[in-house]
Each structure stands twice: as structure tokens, then as C-alpha cells.
């Protein structure tokens, strides 16, 4: 396995660890999710380019579309929570209080 793949997998692992450890603020969770999606996009693109599998060439673009939708929904949720509660704590996202 080359160093590029190892670095991308390590970036995904660091983002996943950050998501699991620093769950107090919504903004830090969104940044970790974006880091995970970016590393998945780069890994999928490199694997498709190296394997010359042209049928799956749309998969990274579809992944990027889902990442953009996730970012838009996350930022709208962040704006709504910060306007309602004044903070961006994840503990405010209890469904029983809404």
C-alpha cells in the first residue's frame, strides 16, 4: 500500500476520532464530518483512477453531491440551533424538547 493511501486513511481516522471525541459543539462535529467526506472523495477518486474502472467514474461526483447536501443541512441546523438557544451545543438537539 502506498504512502498516499495510508495518509488518506489516516486523515479519515483522525476525522472519525475527532467526531467521536469532540462532540460538544455542532460546528466541530460538522468540520469532522467534512474531513471524513473529503478523505473518502479523494480515496475513491484515486482508486478509480488507478484501477481504470470507467464505469464507476461518477461515484466520486455523487459522493461530493451528498457531501454538499450534508453540509447545507448541517449549517442550516447550526443556524437554527444558535438562533433558538444561543449556543451550538449538541446537547440542545434533544428531540423530546423540540
UniProtKB/Swiss-Prot annotation:
The keyword Signal does not apply. Belongs to the complex I subunit 4L family. One of its GO terms (molecular function) is NADH dehydrogenase (ubiquinone) activity. Core subunit of the mitochondrial membrane respiratory chain NADH dehydrogenase (Complex I) which catalyzes electron transfer from NADH through the respiratory chain, using ubiquinone as an electron acceptor. Part of the enzyme membrane arm which is embedded in the lipid bilayer and involved in proton translocation. It is a multi-pass membrane protein. The chain crosses the membrane at residues 1-21, 29-49, 61-81. Its EC number is 7.1.1.2. GO terms for cellular component: mitochondrial inner membrane; respiratory chain complex I. Its main location: mitochondrion. It catalyses: a ubiquinone + NADH + 5 H(+)(in) = a ubiquinol + NAD(+) + 4 H(+)(out). This is NADH-ubiquinone oxidoreductase chain 4L. Keywords: Electron transport, Membrane, Mitochondrion, Mitochondrion inner membrane, NAD, Respiratory chain, Translocase, Transmembrane, Transmembrane helix, Transport, Ubiquinone. The keyword Electron transport applies. It is found in: Mitochondrion inner membrane.
Amino acid at each position: 500500500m502506498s504512502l498516499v493511501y495510508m495518509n488518506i486513511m489516516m486523515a479519515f481516522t483522525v476525522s472519525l476520532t475527532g467526531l467521536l471525541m469532540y462532540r460538544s459543539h455542532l460546528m466541530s462535529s460538522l468540520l469532522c464530518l467534512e474531513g471524513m467526506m473529503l478523505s473518502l472523495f479523494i480515496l475513491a477518486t484515486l482508486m478509480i483512477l488507478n484501477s481504470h474502472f470507467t464505469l464507476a467514474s461518477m461515484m466520486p461526483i455523487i459522493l461530493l453531491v451528498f457531501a454538499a447536501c450534508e453540509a447545507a443541512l448541517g449549517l442550516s441546523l447550526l443556524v437554527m440551533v444558535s438562533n433558538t438557544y444561543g449556543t451550538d451545543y449538541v446537547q440542545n438537539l434533544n428531540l423530546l424538547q423540540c
